[in-house]
Amino acid sequence: MENFDPLGIHTGESIVVAPTCSLDDQELALLQELSKKVIRHIGIVGECNIQYAFNSETDDYRVIEVNARLSRSSALASKATGYPLAFVAAKLALGYTLDQIGEMGTPNSAYVAPSLDYLICKIPRWDLSKFAGVSRQIGSSMKSVGEIMSIGQSFEEIIQKGLRMIGQGMHGFVGNRDLEFGNLEEELSHPTDLRIFAIAKAFEEGYSIDRIYNLTKIDPWFLGKLKNIHDYSLVLSKYDKIEDVPAAVLQEAKRLGFSDFQIARFVEDPDGNIEKESLRVRAVRKKNNVLPSVKRINTVASENPELTNYLYVTYDGTEHQVPYFKNEKSVVVLGSGAYRIGSSVEFDWCSVNAVQTARKLGYKSIMINYNPETVSTDYDMSDRLYFDELSFERVLDVLDLEMPKGVIVSVGGQIPNNLAIRLHRQDIPVLGTSPLSIDRAENRHKFSSMLDQLGIDQPAWKELSHMDEVYDFVGKVGYPVLVRPSYVLSGAAMNVCYNAEELETFLKLAAKVSKEYPVVVSQFLQNAKEIEFDAVAHNGEVVEYAISEHVEFAGVHSGDATLVFPAQKIYFETARRIKKIGRKIAKELNISGPFNIQFLAKNNDVKVIECNLRASRSFPFVSKVLKRNFIETATRIMLDTSYEKPDNTNFDIDWIGVKASQFSFSRLHNADPVLGVDMSSTGEVGCIGDDFSEALLTSMISVGYSIPKKAVMVSSGDTRSKVDLLDACKMLQDNGYEIYATGGTEKFLAEHGVKAACVSWPDEGKADNVIHMISAHKFDLVINIPKNHSHRELTNGYKIRRGAIDHNIPLITNARLASAFIEAFCEMKEKDIQIKSWQEYKL
């Protein structure tokens, strides 16, 4: 495998291709011989990963590192070749020899090395725009949160496919929205997450391959292929109508990885309905017999490729390598694509369980997904795996060939969910809830009027296109308000504004407000509980459900919040109202399958925030805690087969689950590690305990917190947060902890009988400056609750938060979570946590 980016960029941050493209046979043989020397010298049994730096001008090389284990690139190598490295490594560890290991799905032994008659490309997925102030430069530290793998017959095809797959609104190497680069040479020589698009811009502006090479040090072989794509976009631009484009030109465009969307953009340059024009391109293509072919990936270098079901779609072929016939007993499941902030392994769990249930019921299951990190892209998980795009165009290509009973869009998160109504318009049978109902739930206006019609309360909101309208609306509902711009200039896409100054600053700096780009302003309820309702319904009747609550008050994104199931601290009446509203919505939308509703509750006042007619991030968690597979039930319903109704409720179980979030702020230099309405966590854990303290403590330790040994620093923000933390601070004092606090917090604690040592703010420059003390590791836990959004408060608070992260000191920025954590470790010691397997928790 070869990194597209030069040495200096972490391999996890680099585009990677396989097999190597820019090395000749002699250079490749040299590196292979070196590898054999290394593994024989170390005595490797099993898997090994060696990274080289290689200068092809001088044949000079360096071994960078050797990992005598399965690595991140091992998973990529397995998916790239179809050779199951982990399976073979496990057998070798058990004492088998290579020639004794039969490769899964073929009669061949693992002794045969895989050979590739195709190319693959891995591209990282970054979500840096989620973090205010973060450096976008990429280098030796890994910041990407996911990756994709594309397969094809040419580099041009795989890079264009791959750039569509990363799911950031890009359509390939060319034909994207116009990106602004202040200094293009700077962008090319100091790489950021957008460098590949800076190269596209450079070609547009007439840069030569040599000039780009001198700035980027990316091998000219790759740059030449990218130039081919740019040059062919100019060929397409010469035509005014798609009907005028010769079939040979269309065929070559498709071979170079151009999507129908890109072709429509270059030929027709439509201002209006680009989807309509893309479908026109599709129709003309099909009429001219410019069609894709489906190829197999041979899972070893065997004589029996017909035994494998690992497929990809390409335009560089003349016939399909698999047979096709209409099969009413087949079902297509759309996967979740690249891991990103907001969509991760939870949806892969849902996809895999849907596929397994379909297979159990005798259906031929067909999976479309392109994430090499997932279980759903293991070729033995489904009857057919299309390792390919989840674009509208590609899904239609597969459905045209497979002609299944239908397609499941509700288990892979938002990507497949967004395709539901478009597939419906093409007369594709979508299994489960009707796409028209999905559209009613997804469309803010339709959903809001449905809630009004059903008499269900919701926070007041309005879509506004003038600043005057924004201020009028805020005058009616009062501060704080949640602002969602439709066009974001910089920073987070959503923000809570607590006063007129903040509102004005946010809208001026972060968003455009106009008729074309309206802004949605919602009433924001302070100190309200956020509650999740995960459920499965059949023809509008709720079959099973789970009610879980957030530890944090509303204002922390549900993906970052600490989730407790079953809910421990909500009124019985609140739970009753939530069930009633859930049933009403399920009936009105005639839901058949999974769905999730998010509620706000204050006292017994319950409001609906949103409803998703698909599996949510919390489905695997509640399924595992409750020991009932919600996705299996949902899949059975979608396939019109019998299912088991639960005979117990959420509150019959004698244990508690807590889901805690994992953050990666230490890798994101300069990012402010404070939680808000935009999600920033990159992972999660779920833990079970006999009571809330045990479950919370286990989950917090699992995401990297440690129980403080001696000293805790508290900077508790506004009065409400001070009150929320008071009992917890008393517990710290009673348990012998040293408490340090900033001025206002120290004074408040002293007034209420808690002794704390006062530390000065970062900008005060005194000897007891909190930043000096953080640098000296004087604290075992830092609690910093943002007080308000004034410049001094933000700057001082930011320095404390960032200091804690940079010095690897556990940090909590939410008063309710801090309070719960302190109570948990004061009530229970780490040695008292029981070690129990999941199977030991029994109903």
Residue ranges and their predicted role:
Residues 1-257, 276, 292-293, 302, ...:
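ATP-dependent carboxylate activation and anion-phosphoryl transfer catalytic cores
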Residues 479-486:
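Conserved anion/nucleotide-ligand pocket segment
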Residues 215, 225-226, 266, 280-284:
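Residues in the recognition helix of alpha-helical DNA-binding motifs
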Residues 162, 271-274, 284-289, 295-456, ...:
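ATP-binding N-terminal substructure of ATP-dependent carboxylate-amine bond-forming enzymes
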